[in-house]
Amino acid sequence: MEFSVAHPAVKAFMCGSLSGTCSTLLFQPLDLVKTRLQTLQSGVQPGTGRVGMVTVFVNVLRTEKLLGLWRGVSPSFVRCIPGVGIYFSTYFTLKQRYFSSGAPGPLQAVLLGAGARCVAGVFMLPVTVIKTRFESGRYRYSGVFGALRSVCQTEGPKALFSGLMATLLRDAPFSGIYVMIYSQTKHLLPPEISQSSYAPVANFSCGVLAGVLASVLTQPADVVKTHIQVSPDVFSRTSDVVRYIYKEHGLVGFFRGAVPRSLRRTMMAAMAWTVYEQLMAQIGLKS
């Protein structure tokens, strides 16, 4: 099938997948550092020295060398390339179906972003579980497919969907908030900027602002999700993780890893949306 005659949703999928590839490769180290920071909570007792982002970063370089920062990039690719594609194609389809006559309002933008993320999140959750375990450093899998086989044999297929509720509680609000802020701030741009050669830079800046706010608001759900997926034998329910984190580390425990996650999610989302919109414009489709 030639690209020029492909269905618009297929084109949106391809543009989204390409944008996801670029952003994932660039910002994978931040995701690894975020995961290590969050999973360190299990082994750090209250009152001990604080382990920060720089400490984890240096430790990875010392023990696993430079390429260690890209540990887990294979499952990240397996997740993000189709995952981002599914997200953008779903978003495009929903927007064309319900808002083809005009731009969605703030609440409608939230529903669009959250709905598209839920669809992509459910489809890609098994790979998300494997990616999180790869990055944690606690598991020694031979590869993505070896990890899938190992989990199914030792824990059952159900383990591949561990943290589903926490993942949706994190990703759906993040995407909804992000799309709402991103779309509304873009509308505030004057025409001389939004219609000029500086539009990609301006759009990226809007994406950064939206990403920071959305990341901070959804950080607690990300911490809970990571604990469930890394230690499914210890935490069987979301409420168990919430009680554990609060008891051992207080409210601050829910924001462990916030800096690297905010950096990564913000930069990845801003880049993915900017690249996606530029690619869609190049092929004559309104994103």
Swiss-Prot record:
It comes from the Eukaryota. One of its GO terms (molecular function) is glycine transmembrane transporter activity. SUPFAM superfamilies: Mitochondrial carrier. It holds the Pfam family Mito_carr. It catalyses: glycine(in) = glycine(out). It is found in: Mitochondrion inner membrane. It is a multi-pass membrane protein. GO terms for cellular component: mitochondrial inner membrane; mitochondrion. One of its GO terms (biological process) is erythrocyte differentiation. At 24 hours post-fertilization, expressed predominantly in posterior blood island, posterior cardinal vein and circulating blood, as well as in somites, brain and retina. At 34 hours post-fertilization, becomes restricted to posterior blood island and circulating blood. Keywords: Membrane, Mitochondrion, Mitochondrion inner membrane, Repeat, Transmembrane, Transmembrane helix, Transport. Disruption phenotype: Fishes lacking both slc25a38a and slc25a38b display anemia. Mitochondrial glycine transporter that imports glycine into the mitochondrial matrix. Plays an important role in providing glycine for the first enzymatic step in heme biosynthesis, the condensation of glycine with succinyl-CoA to produce 5-aminolevulinate (ALA) in the mitochondrial matrix. Required during erythropoiesis. May play a role as pro-apoptotic protein that induces caspase-dependent apoptosis. Belongs to the mitochondrial carrier (TC 2.A.29) family. SLC25A38 subfamily. This is Mitochondrial glycine transporter A. The lineage of its organism: Eukaryota, Metazoa, Chordata, Craniata, Vertebrata. The gene is slc25a38a.
